[in-house]
Every structure is written in C-alpha cells, then in structure tokens.
Amino acid sequence: MATVIAKVKVMPTSPEVEKESLKESLKELVEQNDAKCRGVTDEPLAFGLYTVYVMVEMEEKEGGMDPIEEAMNALENVESAEVVELSLV
C-alpha cells in the first residue's frame, strides 16, 4: 500500500477560539485515527479570523481521509474542515 499525504484546511468557529488549543486538539485527533501529524500551521484570514492547515500522513486504505475529516468537523470549535490537497508518496 502507498502512503497518503493530505493537507486539511480547518476554519475555527470564531476569532476568539484559542489557536494553540485548537492546533493541539487537531494533532491529537489525527494520532487517534492511526495517522501521523506532519505539521500544523495557521494563516491570518480577516478580522482576527485565521485558517489552520494540518498535514496528515497515513497508509492508503478504504475510506481514505473521510474518518479524520468527519472527526475534525465534529470538534467543538471547528466551523469546517476539508481536504484541500491529497497525494500519494
């Protein structure tokens, strides 16, 4: 099987969401889903809002990134999470 690298774009619910706490929650969630977190970055968006990008490495399997994406969307302070890049290594 191949290794999959995915970039997930995560939007917090508001600018008041504590950035470092959200990043730590995302890292833990990735590792709980049998994947490796290869980095978490944030970029300013507008009016204090920011976007978080999570790089995920995992073995290719049926369902792919769907379980991780769904789990991220279920987090309390996450407005949306979507895979924006996906590649095989």
From Swiss-Prot:
Query: What GO annotations for molecular function exist for this entry?
Result: translation elongation factor activity
Q: Does the keyword Membrane apply?
A: no
Decide whether keyword Cell inner membrane is in the record: no
Q: Which Pfam families match?
A: EF1_GNE
The record, for InterPro entries, names:
eEF-1beta-like_sf, EF1B_bsu/dsu_GNE, Transl_elong_EF1B/ribsomal_bS6, Transl_elong_EF1B_B_arc
Disulphide bonds in the chain:
none
Gene3D superfamilies tied to this protein: 3.30.70.60
Alphabetized UniProt keyword annotations: Elongation factor, Protein biosynthesis
Q: Report the sequence similarity comment from the record.
A: Belongs to the EF-1-beta/EF-1-delta family.
Primary role: Promotes the exchange of GDP for GTP in EF-1-alpha/GDP, thus allowing the regeneration of EF-1-alpha/GTP that could then be used to form the ternary complex EF-1-alpha/GTP/AAtRNA.
- UniProt protein name: Elongation factor 1-beta
